[in-house]
Regions:
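SAM-dependent transferase fold signal centered on methyltransferase-like domains
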Residues: 1-346
Length: 346
């Protein structure tokens, strides 16, 4: 048995700090749930009375492992301590990770440890890189909690739920802040125009750039397209009826929806700027419109990129151009955001 200080649940952190400062807190022992109170383990140095609070004898509990590698056997972990994967993606009930060559023989042990560690995980997948025309993840299922093999799952981003399938359609959770900023720019554009706006995303994927706009009062219509039919299937699940969804070549979309869009989203990082000339026909005339896009460029080509965009849009149509570095892509390249406010004559 071990002595535990019984404290009000709401004051637990305060008492942990109090005990820690006095070196009275027992190491490597878990705090216990006592209903509306918590039992904080005391070491042998702690006195028999502390601020008039009850001290109770409880069977000590080991703290829950903090990382899935803590659930591997000590001998196995120590033998390959430099090689266990330290990063993974948790997408809904999927865990996706790359397995270093040195520990490939222990995929089952890795998967079992992850399933034990994370109760919400249904499937553990090895990431073998990207494949195919649409550059989707090549996933190999290592283990499934319930025997299912589907990699379709649901994620939540800024209060919106999205159906995704990383084995069939590209999705990255790492641009959530960019998507929120895009939404705010859409709100601002609607205010400047004093009316509802039409938003077009020719490279919509499963719809992460559009989900925040879906169902909002200031949005008249969403036009969404993607060349990947599997992405379009999920896109239809993620957007409401107030949208036109198709599986079309982005460069042909202006023929289908000429001069319809107020806000155009262009997220095809390796080709975004080269595709701009064929996308301009989507934008409305006689009022302000906006392009918000992302591209990967050489870090030394910032001024050249700015000049290229201006040559495509034409100076007489340009209200404002902002180019902002977002993150490094490689030692030579970076991801940028370009935001273009335009006024085309009618």
């Amino acid at each position: 048995m071990m002595r535990h200080l019984s404290v009000p649940r709401t004051d637990t952190s305060l008492w942990i700090e109090f005990l820690s400062k006095r070196d009275w807190l027992a190491a490597s022992v878990a705090i216990q749930n006592l209903g509306d109170r918590r039992g904080i383990p005391l070491n042998q140095s702690a006195p028999n009375t502390i601020e008039g609070l009850p001290i109770v004898d409880l069977e000590p509990k080991l703290p829950e492992p903090k990382h899935w590698t803590d659930r591997l056997s000590v001998e196995l972990f120590d033998q390959y301590s430099d090689f266990w994967p330290t990063a993974n993606d948790q997408l809904g009930d999927l865990v996706i990770l790359k397995i270093p060559e040195e520990v490939k023989d222990f995929k089952q042990e890795i998967a079992d440890a992850i399933l034990t560690h994370s109760e919400r995980t249904r499937i553990v997948c090895e990431d073998k890189g990207v494949k195919g025309e649409f550059r989707v993840r090549d996933l190999r299922i290592m283990a499934s909690r319930d025997g299912t093999k589907s990699t379709r799952t649901q994620v939540k981003e800024h209060s919106k739920k999205l159906w995704i399938d990383p084995a069939k359609a590209y999705y990255s959770p790492r641009l959530g802040t960019e998507r929120l900023n895009t939404f705010e720019e859409g709100v601002n554009l609607a205010k400047r125009l004093s009316r509802k706006i039409v938003i077009c995303d020719p490279y919509a994927g499963v719809g992460p750039n559009l989900s925040l706009f879906d169902g909002e009062d200031f949005v008249k219509l969403i036009i969404a397209s993607d060349l990947n039919p599997d992405a379009v299937e999920l896109l239809k699940l993620n957007l409401s009826g107030n949208s036109l969804i198709s599986c079309d070549d982005a460069k042909e979309l202006a023929k289908i929806h000429p001069e319809k869009a107020d806000l155009l989203l262009v997220n095809l990082p390796h080709d975004s700027i080269d595709h701009l000339p064929s996308l301009l026909g989507l934008l409305g005339r006689g009022h302000e419109v906006m392009i918000r896009g992302w591209a990967i460029i050489n870090k030394d080509m910032f001024l050249e990129t700015e000049a290229k965009i201006k040559s495509i849009i034409k100076e007489e149509n340009l209200i404002k151009l902002d180019i902002t570095p977002i993150k490094s892509y490689s030692p030579q390249d970076e991801v940028i955001r370009f935001q273009i406010r335009i006024l085309f004559a009618e």
